[in-house]
Regions:
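ABC ATPase NBD Q-loop/coupling interface
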Residues: 62-85
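The feature captures the beta-strand-to-loop junction immediately N-terminal to the Walker
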Residues: 38-40
Length: 257
């Protein structure tokens, strides 16, 4: 196994009530990279994220994780919370922050994810934890907003807060489902820039439809079509491929995985 391999998806297939959602999918994700899954509606992109984090069990195949420090971990068959503890976290498309808590309190809850909500609220945050929260909020441009309620944040800011809530846990992999959804061009660009900063410390796997966003930050792109890997490579190879153009890039306006 190459030293820069962090995640290996091997021969993964999924069948839902007779429908073949994924067929023999093989993907290798490199350490400290931003790896995109793209494809038209129903291609299997979000299902693949579900397989990685154990929300969905594959019909066949497996997913293996190669942490920086430690032995190979087989994620397939593990409980979702155990995968989080291994260092694989996920942010869904719709922000799920606690809107009645401040930005800082949301960060504290995420940092103490192994505790209950009320335990986390009343637990005294250490100076080291406060410093980590401040540093993380600065990375996403919310350091001056930490004392306001999350309900007061704009849509893009809520997305950045939730990304920060994942990153503060010091994961090795962050899974993102359409992080730029609902954003204007300036917010989308800023999201890309903060993800490029974050990838210095962890790997990011993204499901996305916005091709400008993909072009901005992708290190590797896996194109899915009808549950199979159509091709994989850098964004320039993907954009130049006539088959990809025919089945995906020529089908604009699609927003759902």
């Amino acid at each position: 196994m190459e030293k820069d391999t962090l995640l290996k998806i091997k021969n993964v297939s999924v069948v839902f009530d007779g429908f073949q959602a994924l067929t023999d999918v093989n993907v290798t994700v490199k350490r400290n990279s931003i790896h995109f899954f793209i494809g038209p509606n129903g291609a299997g992109k979000t299902t693949l994220l579900d397989i990685i984090c154990a929300k969905t069990k594959p019909t066949g195949g497996n997913v293996s994780f190669y942490p920086m420090h430690g032995e190979k971990v087989r994620l397939t068959g593990m409980k979702e919370y155990k995968i989080v503890k291994e260092g694989v976290v996920r942010k869904f498309q719709v922000p799920s922050v606690f809107v009645n808590l401040t930005v800082e309190e949301n960060m504290e809850l995420s940092l103490k994810g192994n505790k209950g909500v009320w335990q986390s609220i009343f637990h005294r945050t250490s100076e080291e934890e406060k410093a980590l929260i401040d540093e993380t909020l600065k990375k996403v441009g919310l350091e001056k907003r930490k004392d306001i309620l999350a309900s007061s944040l704009a849509h893009g800011e809520k997305q950045w807060l939730e990304i920060a809530m994942q990153f503060v846990q010091k994961p090795e992999i962050i899974l993102l489902d359409e992080p730029a959804a609902g954003m204007g061009k300036p917010e989308t660009f800023k999201t890309g820039e903060l993800l490029k900063e974050i990838k210095k410390e962890c790997t990011i796997i993204v499901v996305e439809h916005d091709m400008d966003f993909v072009k901005q930050i992708a290190d590797c792109v896996t194109v899915l079509h009808e549950g199979k890997v159509l091709m994989e490579g850098d964004i320039h190879q993907v954009l130049a491929d006539e088959t990809v153009q025919a089945v995906y890039l020529g089908r604009g306006g699609e927003r759902n995985a």
